[in-house]
Amino acid sequence: MIAPVSREVVLVHGMSHGGWAWERLARRLERDGHRVMAPDLPGHGRRAHERRHASLAAYARAVADAAIQAGFSRATIVGHSMGGAVLPGVAALIPARIARLVFLAAVVPAHGTTTLQGHITPAGRQMMHGLARANDLAIQYPALFEWSRWMGDLPLGDPRVSETLPRLTPQPLRPLTERVDMRRFHALRLPCTYIRCLRDAAVTPPRAAEYAARLGVTPIDMDCAHNPMLSAVDELAKILTTLD
């Protein structure tokens, strides 16, 4: 009998989340013998006090440092939601340590565009800038909006929702307004996977299909909302650990 392959996995959280968002998935992967890192990006999670240092470059460095410190040499790096805009920077920093990049319900910016410019409608951008101006250049959505947009496949009273909502922190505006340089990413031609969530209200299925096409891949579909690391842990773990 062939022993299962132990994988190195780095989990990159999205907007307003932290490394804590991956706790259920990380436990599942570690139980099966995989090595997992789920760093907090600057301004998030246990690093929420570093909000003023948040940038795409700082995000990418935090992920690269986590992989290096763990001694990973062939890592699967998973970027969720806004984390998709972080992966090109990570690829440029540590290409030799990456086996595959996985975009999970993630934005895939076109070269030279910003996350807000490429993903959010003009009205949505106006709203987000207004929220940021009122909150020290960081965006905090109302809790009901966060639930419906990110966790709509779970009842509002579900423990996974009630545990998550209080842990969400204001999202620094700056990384969302920085232009993403995709040239090095495209030149590296690293293996990529896109996972599309069919009940996603944040990265809708048609938009996710556009992002997958931008990567030149056919998306893998999951029947869930935006946060499968909460609502579809086993299925997500299986996908991540059976990629070539």
Task: List where the protein language model places each region.
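Conserved HGGG/HGGXW glycine-rich cap/lid loop of the alpha/beta-hydrolase fold
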Residues: S6-A48
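Conserved loop-alpha-helix segment in the C-terminal half of the alpha/beta-hydrolase fold
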Residues: C197-L230, L243
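Short beta-strand/loop motif that positions the catalytic acidic residue
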Residues: L188, Y194-R196
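Active-site loop/oxyanion-hole signature of alpha/beta-hydrolase fold enzymes
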Residues: R35-A75, A92-L93, T115-I120
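Flexible "cap/lid" loop of the alpha/beta hydrolase fold
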Residues: A92-L93, R97-I139, R174-L176, T204
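Conserved alpha/beta-hydrolase catalytic His-Asp/Glu region
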Residues: D136-R189
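Gly/Ala-rich beta-loop-alpha elbow adjacent to hydrolase catalytic centers
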Residues: V78-G83, L87
